């Protein structure tokens, strides 16, 4: 038993030793962990201390920078007082809380504006704070503008854009000689009120008792008679603003606010209404020379689809830069294409859908917009106006186009003004200045519109995740619906414009170099060359005319090919007369296939005429020459096929005279269709007009009803029917002194010769030369009418 107990005791001792060893190891491991934690804590403390030191250093640097900025601001404010507001005896203003020299009264501008505004608004205490905070914001805007001008004068431009803008640390040289400052003062625009005359007529009828009240009850809501309607509608009223050189300005406002109207007036593109006010370039009125400084890019891209990018710009360069050589024009065009990012698309076609339905592959929508910008930049303008440059483009192409415009302001010093509606935030922050037009009045112009709106009302703060453009339009809507707020906003801007902005108008000298106008002959040559290129490249339309001419010739030849094979008798003579009638009728209807072409070309012409690239007359002559030449080949094919198959009077003289008659008829029809398309302006109206005219022409052409059989009441109509003169000329050529074969008795011989048939048709006293002469007069008439329609009707009205 003792042995067993001793053994157990030994076992217990062994276990206790093992436990002691384990405890010792645990203690060591814990000690190691504690040491590691201590080391890591020490390292963290050291890092925190280093971070604190860095933060302190950054704070010190920021404080130093703020102090420097405050000093610079104070210096600038002193400069503003001395430069913009010179000392005057008893009337002098200061910016915000800045005072003048001790010798003069210290009048605060914000206090001056507040006192003026208190006469207009009973709630002056609240509005005064808003106005004063708005003035403070405007001071910041002037400081920013002054800083940008200082940076420009040093020949460098530092583009550091935040809040969605691109970062660009490159220093770019600016050509300040290109840019100009544009100021517009008290711009007013009025148009005639159509309802004024309507109301006047109704009131006159009511006074005379010729109309009852019950008859006009349906019109009372649309045309009130209880108040006098103004004779003119005011679209813009006393709009003033300033655009500095090298700025990219956004002209914003709700739909119908007048922003597009203001843009058209600034771009000298308004063709209707009454415009008053002044537009100054570097503080000077320069009259017609203003056109030399600006270019305009329309919302729609209208180009010739078959032209290349280079040819499109070359066309503008040839007509706008007459003093340049071809080599200089080539260099200018390639530089412009490089500026707009199209240097790799030099020989690419514009592309689009041709009038015949053929699709020409070409540029994308954004690239076409850049071509429009390139055409405007060919003349190296100082001002570039764009109407909705992002309209119809996706977000990516819109951003690309706007970045191109931004680069132009930096690289070339070009001043860019765009009318925009709701740009995306990335585009909004690209603009250096924002102008807001509301109900035909200017309510803001500056670089910090969001701060300005918040200064007007504390509720006008843009949420961080909201598009600033959407926010601005929402605020504009609220201001419009609040008459007192709208009146206060407009008055505040007008007072600020008068006292703060207007004195900063530049007086820099202007070097006006008005280029010579291109001569008519050169304009004709350039337009004719482009028309020829388009004609050659659009082969579908021309070949379709050729195919139709061949089919008409073969079809008529198949139907009348056996006539007169054994000699022409009186029955076959009537068939040949029917052949002549159908040929002339076909030649009258064949130009209808080109109506869509004529209308589409008219759209291009209107766009180019609005830009005053060329005079309409040389353009018209150049484009009509192509129609004259192509028409001859169509008539030549039809006449030759019929003369070779149908047994007509064969002689070279008869063939040539017949060809002339058919060609004159076809040419008159072509010019008639062109005249109708120029007057109507649309494909549908042109078809309607031409169809009505053709029915009358065919009916009185002299075949269906001989002119001797027409009643006296409307028998004169054949005298104004050019188809009649064509039909009479061809009948005289074929039948005069031509012997017919008489039938065997008892069938009477009605026409023993062609003279009898000519007499039956009432053409006894007609001569070939007389018919051709009158036909020539009709061709000249339609030619002149086509030009008048091009020149006077369906102009681009803006």
UniProtKB/Swiss-Prot annotation:
Organism: Dictyostelium discoideum (Social amoeba)
Compartments in which it is found: Membrane
Protein name: ABC transporter G family member 4
GO molecular function: ABC-type transporter activity; ATP binding; ATP hydrolysis activity; ATPase-coupled transmembrane transporter activity
Classification via SMART domains: AAA
Annotated ranges, domain ABC transmembrane type-2: 540-793
Biased composition, class Low complexity, residue ranges: 42-51
Positions of the UniProt region annotated as Disordered: 1-51
Biased composition range(s): Polar residues: 30-41
Pfam families attached to this UniProt entry: ABC2_membrane, ABC_tran
Compositional bias ranges of the Basic and acidic residues kind: 12-29
Assigned GO CC terms: ATP-binding cassette (ABC) transporter complex; membrane
Keyword terms: ATP-binding, Coiled coil, Membrane, Nucleotide-binding, Transmembrane, Transmembrane helix, Transport
Residues covered by the ABC transporter domain: 211-464
The family this protein is said to belong to: Belongs to the ABC transporter superfamily. ABCG family. Eye pigment precursor importer (TC 3.A.1.204) subfamily.
Binding-site residues, ATP: 253-260
Protein topology in the membrane: Multi-pass membrane protein
Gene: abcG4
InterPro entries (alphabetical): AAA+_ATPase (IPR003593), ABC2_TM (IPR013525), ABC_transporter-like_ATP-bd (IPR003439), ABC_transporter-like_CS (IPR017871), ABCG_transporters (IPR050352), P-loop_NTPase (IPR027417)
Transmembrane segments: 540-560, 579-599, 628-648, 656-676, 687-707, 713-733, 771-791
Coiled coil start-end: 34-83
Any one biological process term the GO annotation gives: transmembrane transport
């Amino acid at each position: 038993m003792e042995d067993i107990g001793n053994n157990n005791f030994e076992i217990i001792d062994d276990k206790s030793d093992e436990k002691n060893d384990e405890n010792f190891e645990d203690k060591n491991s814990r000690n190691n962990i504690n040491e590691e934690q201590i080391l890591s804590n020490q390292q963290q403390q050291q890092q925190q201390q280093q971070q604190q030191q860095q933060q302190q250093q950054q704070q010190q640097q920021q404080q130093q920078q703020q102090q420097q900025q405050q000093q610079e601001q104070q210096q600038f404010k002193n400069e503003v007082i001395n430069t913009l507001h010179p000392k005057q005896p008893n009337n002098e203003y200061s910016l915000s809380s800045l005072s003048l020299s001790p010798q003069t009264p210290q009048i605060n501008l914000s206090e001056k504006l507040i006192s003026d505004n208190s006469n207009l608004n009973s709630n002056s205490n609240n509005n005064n704070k808003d106005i004063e905070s708005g003035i403070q914001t405007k001071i910041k805007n002037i400081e920013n503008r002054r800083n940008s001008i200082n940076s420009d004068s040093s020949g460098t431009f530092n583009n550091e854009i935040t809040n969605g803008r691109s970062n660009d640390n490159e220093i770019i040289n600016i050509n300040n000689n290109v840019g100009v400052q544009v100021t517009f003062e008290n711009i007013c625009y009025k148009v005639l009120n159509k309802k004024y005359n309507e109301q006047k007529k109704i009131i006159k009828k009511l006074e005379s008792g010729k109309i009852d009240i019950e008859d006009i009850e349906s019109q009372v809501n649309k045309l009130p008679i209880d108040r006098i309607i103004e004779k003119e509608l005011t679209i813009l009223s006393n709009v003033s603003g300033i655009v500095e050189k090298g700025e990219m300005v956004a002209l914003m406002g709700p739909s119908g606010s007048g922003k597009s109207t203001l843009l058209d007036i600034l771009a000298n593109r308004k063709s209707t209404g009454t415009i008053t006010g002044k537009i100054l370039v570097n503080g000077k009125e320069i009259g017609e020379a203003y056109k030399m400084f600006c270019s305009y890019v329309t919302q729609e891209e209208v180009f010739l689809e078959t032209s290349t990018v280079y040819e499109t710009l070359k066309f503008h360069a040839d007509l706008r830069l007459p003093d340049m050589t071809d080599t200089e024009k080539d260099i200018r065009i390639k530089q412009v294409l490089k500026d707009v990012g199209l240097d790799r698309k030099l020989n690419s076609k514009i592309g689009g859908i041709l009038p015949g339905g053929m699709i020409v592959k070409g540029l994308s929508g954004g690239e076409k917009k850049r071509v429009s910008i390139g055409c405007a930049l060919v003349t190296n303008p100082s001002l570039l106006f764009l109407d909705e440059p992002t309209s119809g483009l996706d977000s990516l192409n819109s951003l690309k186009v706007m970045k191109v415009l931004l680069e132009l302001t930096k690289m070339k010093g070009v001043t860019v003004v765009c009318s925009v509606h709701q740009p995306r935030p990335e585009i909004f922050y690209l603009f250096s200045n924002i102008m807001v037009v509301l109900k035909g009045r200017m309510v803001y112009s500056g670089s910090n519109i969001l701060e300005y709106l918040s200064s007007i009302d504390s509720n006008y703060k843009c949420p961080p995740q909201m598009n600033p453009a959407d926010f601005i339009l929402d605020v504009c809507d609220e201001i419009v619906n609040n008459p007192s707020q709208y009146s206060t906003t407009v008055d505040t801007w007008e007072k600020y414009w008068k006292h703060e902005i207007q004195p900063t108008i530049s007086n820099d000298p202007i070097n006006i170099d008005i280029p010579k106008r291109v001569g008519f002959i050169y304009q004709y040559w350039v337009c004719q060359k482009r028309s020829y290129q388009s004609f050659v490249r659009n082969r579908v339309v021309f070949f379709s005319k050729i195919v139709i001419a061949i089919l008409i010739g073969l079809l008529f030849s198949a139907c009348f090919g056996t006539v007169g094979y054994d000699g022409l008798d009186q029955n076959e003579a009537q068939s040949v007369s029917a052949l002549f009638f159908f040929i002339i009728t076909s030649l009258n209807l064949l130009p209808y296939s080109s109506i869509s072409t004529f209308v589409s070309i008219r759209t291009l012409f209107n766009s180019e005429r609005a830009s005053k690239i060329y005079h309409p007359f040389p353009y018209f002559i150049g484009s009509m020459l192509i129609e004259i030449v192509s028409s001859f080949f169509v008539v030549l094919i039809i006449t030759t096929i019929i003369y070779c198959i149908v047994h007509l009077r064969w002689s070279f003289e008869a063939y040539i005279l017949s060809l002339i008659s058919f060609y004159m008829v076809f040419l008159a029809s072509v010019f008639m269709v062109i005249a109708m398309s120029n007057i109507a302006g649309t494909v549908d109206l042109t078809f309607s007009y031409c169809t009505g005219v053709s029915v009358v022409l065919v009916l009185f052409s002299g075949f269906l009803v001989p002119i001797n059989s027409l009643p006296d009441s409307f028998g004169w109509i054949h005298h104004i029917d050019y188809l009649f003169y064509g039909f009479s000329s061809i009948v005289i050529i074929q039948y005069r002194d031509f012997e017919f074969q008489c039938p065997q008795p008892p069938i009477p011989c009605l026409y023993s010769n062609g003279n009898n048939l000519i007499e039956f048709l009432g053409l006894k006293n007609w001569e070939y030369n007389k018919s051709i002469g009158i036909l020539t007069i009709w061709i000249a008439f339609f030619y002149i009418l086509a030009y008048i329609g091009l020149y006077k009707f369906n102009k681009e009205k803006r």
